[in-house]
């Protein structure tokens, strides 16, 4: 079975989604291509049976989000799980100034992950240590933020839009309506649209954005609207997994394509390094069938994984 885009509901972990898919689809071979926090909703891409071999190539796909950033209150989890640890008055905010601040977060950068995360150091999960009252020294990680757009400023999460046009992800009178976590109070809230690289934590972004504005902050709500090629508008609920439209393996891979001839396909399947001008990762096909995922140095292709 190929790839499925599932719509994760509030409060479930990504592992919960995988377990439900295993039961619904009658197979243990289910993996996902990117964790989504329990207090977030949206796209979780599932790879089933033979398609699980694609996970290693899809977990680095870029992601797109709608994010509600609440200013004036900080929490240890950096989201609405709470409790509130820091609180401060939020000064009047100017939209032009905010947009300039947001520009400073664009591009490659280093980001410190949340203490409440699945990152493992020395055999210990950060969230397990944090819940036991400890704290790990989490090194900053290289991430990239491609786009960060301010949709609007609102007096609270409750006052911010929750219904969006699924084509443009702009607030709308009708469309998709999202369930957000119970708010921790009435705090000024920024509604953002973000396009980020793999490994970027929107909870950390909320914390860092608050710091740039001189106030504590937390993520009041988060919806993943896209993961790689998969849009939330095409995702199915967990109750409808068995009826989900499936995506062929070839269409699931978001890389440039090289159409091979018989000789090139044969050499790649034999593990050789044929000459080719491709630079970077690519998918090689033959007659519409997946042959290999390769890395090119501008002179030769190196097989990362081949399909018989």
UniProtKB/Swiss-Prot annotation:
Family, similarity comment: Belongs to the pseudouridine synthase TruB family. Type 1 subfamily.
One GO BP annotation of this record: tRNA modification
Disulfide bonds: none
PANTHER family xrefs: PSEUDOURIDYLATE SYNTHASE TRUB1 (PTHR13767:SF2), TRNA-PSEUDOURIDINE SYNTHASE (PTHR13767)
Protein's name according to its UniProt entry: tRNA pseudouridine synthase B
Gene Ontology molecular function, alphabetical: pseudouridine synthase activity; RNA binding; tRNA pseudouridine(55) synthase activity
Keywords: Isomerase, tRNA processing
Function: Responsible for synthesis of pseudouridine from uracil-55 in the psi GC loop of transfer RNAs.
Phylogenetic placement of the source organism: Bacteria, Thermotogati, Deinococcota, Deinococci, Deinococcales
Enzyme class label: isomerase
Catalytic residues (UniProt): 37 (nucleophile)
HAMAP family per the UniProt record, alphabetical: TruB_bact
Catalytic activity as recorded in UniProt: uridine(55) in tRNA = pseudouridine(55) in tRNA
Gene: truB
EC numbers on record: 5.4.99.25
Cited CDD domains: PseudoU_synth_EcTruB
InterPro entries for the chain: PsdUridine_synth_cat_dom_sf, PsdUridine_synth_N, tRNA_psdUridine_synth_TruB, TruB_C
Pfam family, one: TruB_C_2
Claim: Glycosyltransferase is one of the keywords in the record: no
